[in-house]
């Protein structure tokens, strides 16, 4: 889908020490799944702390289009009246997913085992992302796909009921593919199995169980086997969404690299399949302390105390990559400020995200004077040992390529730049972290927001 482009630049300049407390908004992954599973339950579910970014709102609108009644009350709690597994309605119009790959891929799984047809469309960035890794297993279950060249959006999915239960071994670590198959398995007679050689985020498994799905997880020599027995009735739930660790990452890294900073990021989800970044930052010498550890909605949560730190270079082990795949852009910024040479490889997946995150980050870091080597599957970065990035008096321009994590990563880089950073378009930030600028302002760093042009 083509939309007119009206860029809204963001300017980030060297910041004073960051201090204060901020409360990170709800987790995007959990917010998506809460809406989908509540819409497939029988009865009324309640969701507190839902992330109200554009991606999650696209999921809400899609579930409305398929029959769910979804509204927000005056206190900010979301009420979802579900239609039940197997009872989704035929959407009358195309489902516009905006920039959300998660919405698109998981909802394709939902549609695949229902007797309905849905056309998925998205923005320019999403329309470039390959969907073959989703259509391949769902086709084995009987769904039919009609797509643009290269298995890209727009894509029409025609579900099959009864769908065919499958046993599928994931060729690459992907929580989205795993989740799509499990969601398709919800309305499929028999047992659908996913074999996961490398663990990925497990929100789908946790939440499916919580809603009453008949799901089991076995582990055998590091391999996870997830089995779902289809056609169970989902029960409505009251979900409290913990804070998003992927969003908190930008605040935490800023606190580590801006000299003199001392801050607290509250309400951060620390699911072990999502917290790899914090493990790596601590290994780099980052002063991060977990305060008030607790459980929220079945997920581990803590407040993070963060102090400016002299970071050391790191080599990221391949085993931890799936637990921090979305956080590598901001880890690249941390590595650029560290002492020594960091090796960050095994990241080929980054080339098919909202942008080619390896190439785009390499281009931007080079513009800031960072010495690096680009590999097919990652970057080798020579850090500045805490010296500011770029040159005094020289503003560096960065193209975000419609990618929220690129835009936010370089906004953080601007806080330790000598001449400032201009990001060409801040609008993608609204997809996942609409209060990004507001929270940084509360900590003492104010971004300049350019006018629409």
UniProtKB/Swiss-Prot annotation:
Stretches assigned to coiled coil: none
Cysteines joined through disulfide linkages: none
Pathway: Metabolic intermediate biosynthesis; chorismate biosynthesis; chorismate from D-erythrose 4-phosphate and phosphoenolpyruvate: step 6/7
Catalytic activity: 3-phosphoshikimate + phosphoenolpyruvate = 5-O-(1-carboxyvinyl)-3-phosphoshikimate + phosphate
Record-linked InterPro entries: Enolpyruvate_Tfrase_dom, Enolpyruvate_Tfrase_sf, EPSP_synthase, EPSP_synthase_CS, RNA3'P_cycl/enolpyr_Trfase_a/b
One term of GO molecular function: 3-phosphoshikimate 1-carboxyvinyltransferase activity
Principal subcellular localisation of the protein: cytoplasm
Domain of life: Bacteria
Subcellular localization: Cytoplasm
One Pfam family recorded for the sequence: EPSP_synthase
GO CC aspect terms: cytoplasm
Keyword Amino-acid biosynthesis: yes
Keyword Amino-acid biosynthesis: yes
The enzyme's E.C. designation: 2.5.1.19
Any one biological process term the GO annotation gives: aromatic amino acid family biosynthetic process
Enzyme class: transferase
Function: Catalyzes the transfer of the enolpyruvyl moiety of phosphoenolpyruvate (PEP) to the 5-hydroxyl of shikimate-3-phosphate (S3P) to produce enolpyruvyl shikimate-3-phosphate and inorganic phosphate.
Record text on subunit structure and interactions: Monomer.
Membership in a protein family: Belongs to the EPSP synthase family.
Protein name according to UniProt: 3-phosphoshikimate 1-carboxyvinyltransferase
Classification of source organism: Bacteria, Pseudomonadati, Pseudomonadota, Alphaproteobacteria, Sphingomonadales
